[in-house]
Swiss-Prot record:
Active site per the UniProt annotation: 103, 196, 198
Pathway: Secondary metabolite biosynthesis
Catalyzed reactions: an S-[(1E)-1-(hydroxyimino)-omega-(methylsulfanyl)alkyl]-L-glutathione + H2O = an S-[(1E)-1-(hydroxyimino)-omega-(methylsulfanyl)alkyl]-L-cysteinylglycine + L-glutamate; (E)-1-(glutathione-S-yl)-2-(1H-indol-3-yl)acetohydroximate + H2O = (E)-1-(glycyl-L-cystein-S-yl)-2-(1H-indol-3-yl)acetohydroximate + L-glutamate; 2-(glutathion-S-yl)-2-(1H-indol-3-yl)acetonitrile + H2O = 2-(glycyl-L-cystein-S-yl)-2-(1H-indol-3-yl)acetonitrile + L-glutamate; (Z)-1-(glutathione-S-yl)-2-phenylacetohydroximate + H2O = (Z)-1-(glycyl-L-cystein-S-yl)-2-phenylacetohydroximate + L-glutamate
Enzyme class: hydrolase
Protein name listed in UniProt: Gamma-glutamyl peptidase 3
Main location: cytoplasm
GO molecular function per UniProt: peptidase activity
Gene Ontology terms describing biological process: glucosinolate metabolic process; proteolysis
UniProt keyword Cytoplasm, yes or no: yes
Name of the gene this protein is made from: GGP3
UniProt GO cellular component terms: cytosol
């Protein structure tokens, strides 16, 4: 008997629009995410949730995992697509489907599970940051696999909102000087990160320049954000390992 192994299938819920730079350089954020978290032989489907595109409810079970991207919108907002996204996440929670929440996605899952989100207490955070990883966490040891769990990890941050109170069912996995909740998990199916494991230096710098040109940021703040990456880089390889092992483990 010939057994044909089913392709693993994942969905990206894109909660932001592609900038002209990202379209020109990468062909869109979808490609940024797939190149970061995807592997050969997998199927990745794009749903522009910001435009109201969602999978049919009956198709949710076909997916092995989901990724919710960052967004310029507030996760505590009441736009139709945000409310719909929360409803879909509630279904995924009930189904125990794996969901990786990034930035806005991290906050959406907090909202869905009864935590509190709002404006960042210490103000917007943009640039490379070192976050402190929780010690002796068995789940993290599993996700890092053959690599020892590091004491800290560098990640690119770009947010003005944050998790103010964790859901009761959540386990805190990382924090920093500027943000109390940098990473958490719920059960084995929700894994959430405030930073952007998919970002690189050029993506960050383009966002900084664009926001600066829109007069939504002071020059001093922009310079400070860029200066964080003068001599350091994010731990992209370790973040990839962590996220892939969660999604596919």
């Amino acid at each position: 008997m010939v057994v044909i192994e089913q392709k693993k299938r994942f969905a990206l819920f894109l909660a932001t629009c592609d900038s002209e730079f990202v379209k020109k350089t990468y062909g869109g954020y979808f490609n940024v995410f797939v190149s970061t978290f995807g592997e050969e032989g997998e199927q990745w489907d794009l749903f522009r949730v910001i435009d109201g595109q969602f999978p049919d409810e009956n198709d949710l079970d076909k997916y092995d995992g989901f990724v919710i991207s960052g967004s310029p919108h507030d996760a505590f907002g009441d736009a139709d697509w945000i409310v719909k996204l929360c409803e879909v996440c509630q279904k995924l929670d009930h189904m125990k489907k794996k969901v990786l929440g990034i930035c806005f996605g991290h906050q959406i899952i907090t909202r869905v599970k009864g935590g509190k989100i709002g404006r960042a207490l210490k103000g917007a955070d943009m640039g490379l940051r070192s976050i402190t990883i929780a010690k002796d966490n068995e789940k993290l040891r599993g996700y890092f696999g053959d690599v020892e769990v590091p004491a800290s990890l560098a990640i690119i941050k770009c947010h003005q909102d944050e998790v103010l109170e964790l859901p009761e069912s959540a386990t805190l996995l990382a924090s920093s000087e500027v943000c109390n909740v940098e990473m958490f998990s719920i059960g084995d199916h929700f894994f959430c990160i405030q930073g952007h494991p998919e970002y690189n230096k050029e993506i960050l710098f383009e966002i900084v320049d664009r926001v600066l040109n829109m007069k939504l940021m002071e020059q001093e703040f922009a310079d400070k954000a860029k200066s964080t990456m003068e001599t350091a880089q994010p731990d992209r390889i370790l973040w990839q390992k962590l996220c892939k092992n969660f999604l596919k483990g």
